[in-house]
Amino acid sequence: MAKINTLWSFFTKDGNIDNFDILNKIHKLDSLNYFEFIKEISINDYNLIFEGTEYDWKTLAVYTKYWIEAQKRIKINEGTFAFFKTHNARVKLKENHYTNELTTLGFIYISRDPRDIVLSYSKHTNKDIDSTIDLLINDTIMGKDKTKNRTLEVLLNWKDHYRSWKKFIKVPSLFLKYEDLVNDIEREINNITDFFYSNFNIEISNKNEKIKNVIKSTNFDNLKNMENKNGFDEKSKYSDFFRSGKTKQWKNELNQNQKNLIEQSCKNQMIELGYM
């Protein structure tokens, strides 16, 4: 999320951010609010999605019918576009795609070394590392408990999540690595601005000055201070959201068996992305 702040800070006047208000303007594509219309179509489907206390595969089968229609109904001024965020894989279930070229103009995908994801998510959820590895390498549905106005998130496993978006070639895309954003933020910011300009004719005014401000205001220490001062909606009850902001911590915190499990499951995609 620190890296998403880097992106959105470009859409402030000068590239500076001193709170998380701008993130609150970026809605989750999986917000329950976007599915209220189901009540007009099928009260049974509506009740299944909205009234239960937990989601299951039966609910998922119903929910997928409305993915594209929900996105079509999002109110965006004609001739403009909006930004959304999601953790979902671009899955196809019962002939229903999570999204398509009619509702998505383009996307930016940020990958991260799965060995570091395990550590980060383990802290975030207070699950042990072995259980978290199981989530990472096996097909997973997140958000089963109805919290924070969120529907199900279909993550699949790490490698298939990546592949699901990689295969979506009908719209412009930019694939970034968390590690590159940490190690060479200026280069990656330029890649992002080039992506917006070449595909959507969005030109950033005062680009060089903004880059300096973006780098300064979205550095990890500043984001952590903002979280400590103002809180952060996506912080878990178990740990700070902006916890360390480092890479390759897995080298010291995973045992050899844990490393092997992840690497054997995700080998081809890890090689493709330069993690192995």
Cite the ranges covered by each PLM segment.
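Short acidic (Asp/Glu) and glycine-rich catalytic loops that position anionic groups and cofactors
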Residues: 170-172, 189-194, 239-245
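Short, charged, surface-exposed loops that flank catalytic or proteolytic processing sites
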Residues: 133, 203-207
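PAPS-dependent sulfotransferase catalytic domain
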Residues: 1-176, 244-276
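Hydrophobic alpha-helical segments
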Residues: 199, 217, 268-272
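PAPS-dependent sulfotransferase catalytic core
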Residues: 209-264
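Secondary-structure transition/capping residues
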Residues: 129, 203, 222-225, 273
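PAPS/PAP-binding and catalytic site of the sulfotransferase fold
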Residues: 1-10, 175-202, 214, 222
